[in-house]
């Protein structure tokens, strides 16, 4: 089965494919030390996009991104070196990348970032609702495409 043919929104993920450096840190604060590296690559068959990250100051991880239940949504299955597993809903359209999860374990999260005009930089951040309803800035993130 050619899943890519069934969900044309998957081609939007091509904007992420490749290697990126990533700066991240507490919202409004200095980035954590060390340069993080993130790669996105298609699993053969293009039904899933595989994301891998190495973050010297934190933890490494992987995510598997595929088609969501709605035509222009994706589902991101997240796994990290701490043993965390999370499932996020995700969109990527008009230069805006969003992810969110409403699960209370440990708290709801959402991410919004924008691509710059040439698609070489993505800037945004994560928010969390530690009490389940009040959103607060959590982590600032900037991705820069490697040449």
What positions do the PLM features span?
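Hydrophobic small-molecule pocket/channel-lining residues, especially in calycin-type beta-barrels
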Residues: 1-147
């Amino acid at each position: 089965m050619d899943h890519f043919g069934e969900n044309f929104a998957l081609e939007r993920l091509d904007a992420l494919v490749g290697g990126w450096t990533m700066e991240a840190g507490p919202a409004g604060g200095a980035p954590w030390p060390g340069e993080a590296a993130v790669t996105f690559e298609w699993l053969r068959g293009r039904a899933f996009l595989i994301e891998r990250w190495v973050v010297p100051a934190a933890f490494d991880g992987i995510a598997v991104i595929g088609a969501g239940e709605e035509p222009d949504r994706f589902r991101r299955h997240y796994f990290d070196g701490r043993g965390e597993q999370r499932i996020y809903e995700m969109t990527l359209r008009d230069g805006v990348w969003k992810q969110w999860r409403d699960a209370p374990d440990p708290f709801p999260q959402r991410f919004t970032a924008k691509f710059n005009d040439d698609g070489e930089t993505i800037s945004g951040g994560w928010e969390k609702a530690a009490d389940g309803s009040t959103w607060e800035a959590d982590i600032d993130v900037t991705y820069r495409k490697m040449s």
